[in-house]
Regions:
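A surface/extracellular/periplasmic glyco- and lipid-processing/surface-interacting theme
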Residues: 1-114, 119, 123-129, 142
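A cross-kingdom marker for long, charged
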Residues: 86-102, 115-190
Length: 190
């Protein structure tokens, strides 16, 4: 399989061959390709867990990572300030099955699909954000363009959004609603 970087992911590791444990691009050392939102999934359904970045200040200051994560940020002792020991790098977050998603008001159809995936498969914490009150999902560049209409001009770094494909403000509100419903699924310490 070829790519613009010769099949190499973060840190120059080959992400297409091997045991699937190399090619990480996250502080958690989880595989870079795992959990990405892929082209067509917002229309056809998401059938796997998603990767999510959480605010560093929310992650546990007591326990920095749990399996399947193999590490945490090098600055975790300073930047992880959360009091919930269940919220660490590698934590699986999910919406409880008792929550009726059909009874909620979704601002975008994409938000509802993301909520269904969060309830059925969960979201794994794979990295951190500096923004204190947001979460960020991993998304394939092609999916960002085709499914959401998001694009970045490589020359200028400017972002553009095709609002005929998605209401970006509505999607942000939907993701914030999903984040408010998520609960940590207990896991063994790494």
């Amino acid at each position: 399989m070829n790519s613009a970087d010769g099949g190499r992911g973060a840190h120059g590791l080959d992400v297409f061959d091997g045991d699937g444990l190399i090619g990480y691009g996250h502080a958690s050392l989880l595989p870079a390709l795992g959990g990405l939102l892929r082209t067509g999934e917002l229309d056809n359904g998401i059938h796997h867990a998603l990767a999510v970045n959480m605010p560093a200040g929310m992650l546990s200051k007591a326990q920095h990572f749990v399996w399947p994560a193999r590490a945490a940020d090098g600055t975790a002792d300073i930047t992880y300030q959360g009091d919930n020991p269940a919220l660490a790098m590698g934590t699986l977050l999910a919406i409880p099955r008792t929550v009726d998603l059909s009874a909620m008001t979704w601002r975008t159809p994409q938000g509802r699909v993301l909520a269904e995936a969060a309830q059925r498969y969960g979201w794994y914490v794979v990295d951190v954000l500096l923004a204190p009150h947001k979460v960020q999902l991993g998304i394939d560049v092609a999916a960002a363009r085709s499914d959401l209409g998001f694009d970045i001009d490589p020359a200028t770094g400017r972002q553009s959004v095709d609002t005929t494909k998605v209401d970006p403000d509505g999607l942000d509100l939907d993701i914030a609603l999903i984040a408010s419903l998520l609960h940590a699924i207990p896991q063994a310490a790494a």
